[in-house]
Amino acid sequence: MILWRIVRPGAAMAYVQTGLVLIAEAMDTQQDSLKPRPAMRAAAFSVHVFTAFGAAIALLAMLEAVREHWAAMFQWLGVALIIDAIDGPIARRLDVKNVQPNWSGDVLDLVVDFVTYVFVPAYAIVASGLLLPVAAPLLGVAIIVTSALYFADLRMKADDNHFRGFPALWNAAAFYLFLLHWPPLWSTLLVAALVVLTFVPFHVLHPVRVVRLRWLTMSLIGIWAVLSLYTLDMDFRVGPGVTLALCAIALWISFSDALIRFARSFA
């Protein structure tokens, strides 16, 4: 009773309210201290800007394609490929997803990939005269539509990071069409087959994320990069040895998983 008289109910309530205010201020201070600093936010956003530059590179590649400067077009697409290869590790290093939660790097990456991997190469395939004239526009439309559906497919990657089906790598397909320069009928049949294979559930090797035999894959990718640069510098006028090596690497990327599974079935 003495304590109750000393500390009246009104005063006790005031003490409680004051305590709650102090706790809330302390929590706000702690949350503020956990917020990313402006420099961190700027660095994280710069990664998104870097990724978006891939779309600008696609425009430059398209301008070269319209002029029928095919080797220059592929060189720009190669720059876009480098951006696509390194922006992800940088984003994970800087924790961009949490530092800049209002910007979706995944969506941005899909947008850039579609114009660099699909749209510009599709134009090159259709406009280059490599296909039968009657089939070229139809196959161009098929490339765009099936690739858009593939990009929206949540099953596009298997659990072991292999791609399911032909992974809409039309920049690579276009490169090989220019390299091989087959008769229009053969090239038309190849493009039609790749369109169909987009939805066939075979596994295509992801050059970076598949762990199995990564050392071999990365070595082959390095060789492929050197030979591809040489091919573009020569405007696709290379000898059969270079062509054979480039085709062998492409076949390994496309069918190594099926080959390994087949070999293991006899073990």
From Swiss-Prot:
GO CC annotations on file: plasma membrane
Family: Belongs to the CDP-alcohol phosphatidyltransferase class-I family.
Keywords in alphabetical order: Cell inner membrane, Cell membrane, Lipid biosynthesis, Lipid metabolism, Manganese, Membrane, Phospholipid biosynthesis, Phospholipid metabolism, Transferase, Transmembrane, Transmembrane helix
GO BP field: phospholipid biosynthetic process
Biological role: Condenses choline with CDP-diglyceride to produce phosphatidylcholine and CMP.
Cofactor(s) required, per the database record: Mn(2+)
Record's subcellular location: Cell inner membrane
Keyword Membrane among record annotations: yes
Lipid bilayer topology: Multi-pass membrane protein
Periplasmic compartment residues: 64-69, 124, 184, 237-239
Cytoplasmic side stretches: 1-42, 91-102, 146-162, 206-215, 261-267
Keyword Transmembrane listed: yes
Major location (coarse): membrane
Protein name: Phosphatidylcholine synthase
Catalysed reaction equations from the record: a CDP-1,2-diacyl-sn-glycerol + choline = a 1,2-diacyl-sn-glycero-3-phosphocholine + CMP + H(+)
EC numbers for this chain: 2.7.8.24
